[in-house]
Amino acid sequence: AQIAEKYTVDRIWVDLEKNGKALRQHGMNTVQSNHQIEDVSIIRDSISQAKLLVRVNPIYEKSKNEITEVIKRGADIIMLPYFSTVDEAKRFVDIVDGRANTILLLETIGAERKVDEIIEGVDMDEIHIGLNDLHLQYGLDFMFELLANGKVEEIVKKIKRKNIPFGFGGIARLDEGMLPARHI
């Protein structure tokens, strides 16, 4: 983290998402982090300028405790993955309650179909489009089909109308994955 920060990386991630991820991505060559909640404190103590982004689990019965704990440990930004409904997105933002910035990780068909309601009715700080899980939900063979078939562009047009900062991703390490990132 310190090396990344030294070279002006502005966000350092801790990925706590575990619930349901192994099942969704079973048998695939995907990155599944083994971070623990204690890593939030360790990384927070090792950086001074970069923002600490923590991806938590999708909404579940212990979300309030998990989110409160990562805030106490120093998260600047919290990302909610794999949500499907406006209510889940609202619940997440309500739990965070302005104590950190919020990013919704749009990676389900349910969330994609409700994107208009989400951007109108949820007070998130950013939206990130997750290509990996979204392409799996659509039954596509390759995550970049979402770029080629116009799905990402369609979502982005809606997000841009509301001037919400956004990004998309799912690219593997430089020389890994079905399509090495250096070729993109």
Regions of interest found by a model, annotated:
Residues A1, I12-V14, L52-V56, I78-L80, ...:
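Hydrophobic faces of well-ordered beta-strands that scaffold small-molecule active sites
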Residues E5-K21:
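N-terminal glycine-rich anion-binding loops that anchor highly charged ligand groups
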Residues Y7-I12, I71-I77, V96-T102, E120-I127:
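Glycine-enriched alpha-helix->loop->beta-strand junction motifs that scaffold or abut catalytic
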Residues G20-I43, Y60-N65, Y82-A100, A111-K114, ...:
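Active-site-adjacent beta->alpha loops and helix N-cap segments on the catalytic face
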